[in-house]
Regions:
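Phosphate/adenylate-binding "loop-and-lid" substructures adjacent to NTP/NAD/dNTP-binding pockets
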Residues: 1-128
């Protein structure tokens, strides 16, 4: 879960918070469903997905519509992200796919195999 009560997030509008969570979820979805890789546990993905759904539900609808990826995530319910990449514009899909590749490469280069296994299997029994 992202703590928006700290700097610089403290001053973000709801649309900015929503856009931030949307981008993270899209990047992790591309990484998982299209690149067959992951750098976050299922539990973490679920927590930020539910945080996004709650924020979208409680904020003003006009504010929600201002979010960057509203057009692709207007009906996101937190259950799965498999279809999100296919909803993106060509430009956004290429841009976020590049980010996903970079994030995974950086994560892999900065962690050991043991650290990666521990991170991906946080709060689960056995390995995925």
């Amino acid at each position: 879960m992202i703590d928006f009560s700290k700097m610089p997030c403290l001053y973000w509008r709801d649309a900015t918070k929503i856009s931030y969570l949307q981008r993270r979820i899209i990047v992790y979805s591309i990484m998982y469903y299209e690149q067959n890789e992951s750098c976050v546990s299922d539990q973490y993905y679920d927590s930020i997905s539910h945080q996004l759904v709650e924020l979208q539900r409680t904020c003003d609808h006009a504010e929600f519509r201002r979010s960057t990826y509203y057009y692709a995530m207007y009906d996101f319910d937190g259950n799965t992200g498999f279809d999100i990449p296919s909803r993106l514009t060509k430009y956004d899909r290429e841009y976020l796919t590049n980010i996903a590749s970079h994030v995974y490469k950086q994560w892999k280069a900065s962690t050991t195999i043991k650290q990666r296994r521990r991170a991906l299997n946080a709060n689960t029994k056995g390995f995925r």
